[in-house]
Curated annotation (Swiss-Prot):
Residues 1-10 are cytoplasmic. Coiled coil: none annotated. Interacts with EnvZ through its soluble periplasmic region. InterPro entries: Modulator_MzrA, SecD-TM. Induction: Regulated by the CpxA/CpxR two-component system. Negatively regulated by EnvZ/OmpR. The gene is mzrA. Gene3D superfamilies: 3.30.70.260. Disulfide bonds: none annotated. This is Modulator protein MzrA. Belongs to the MzrA family.
Length: 127
């Protein structure tokens, strides 16, 4: 009777260790992903934003991969997998886009920083 009890205990411990290792791997992969974003804004209010297709064309011609191109308010956001890709894209777009645009690089290192950025971007009115 003691042999099955030991096997059940060992099975429970190995299951717990396996669950812990799986959880740690998931947490590590989530922390390791560091996206980077380029924000393109017009300097003057009347200037139109470049369309996403022209941005895609410039980046593709230089072999720079990106995750997404999204318009938001009066800004065009381009998301990359790494800050190196974002820096290369910034250099390309600085050369190829006409003057009159601000191209800013934003590294999204953590979920907490993304939430703080969202809170800072929204205007809050009390009273």
């Amino acid at each position: 009777m003691q042999i099955p009890r030991m096997s059940l205990r060992q099975l429970a411990w190995s299951g717990a260790v396996l669950l812990l290792v799986g959880t740690l791997l998931l947490a590590w992969s989530a922390v390791r992903q560091q996206e980077s974003t380029l924000a393109i804004r017009a300097v003057h209010q009347g200037t139109t934003m470049p369309d996403g297709f022209s941005i895609w064309h410039h980046l593709d011609a230089h072999g720079i991969p990106f995750k997404s191109i999204t318009p938001k308010n009066d800004t065009l956001l381009i998301t990359f997998d790494s800050s190196d890709q974002s820096a290369a894209a910034k250099a390309v777009l600085d050369r190829t886009l006409p003057h009159g645009y601000i191209i800013a690089q934003q590294d999204n290192n953590s979920q907490a920083m993304q939430w703080l950025t969202r809170l800072r971007d929204n205007s809050h009115r009390f009273g």
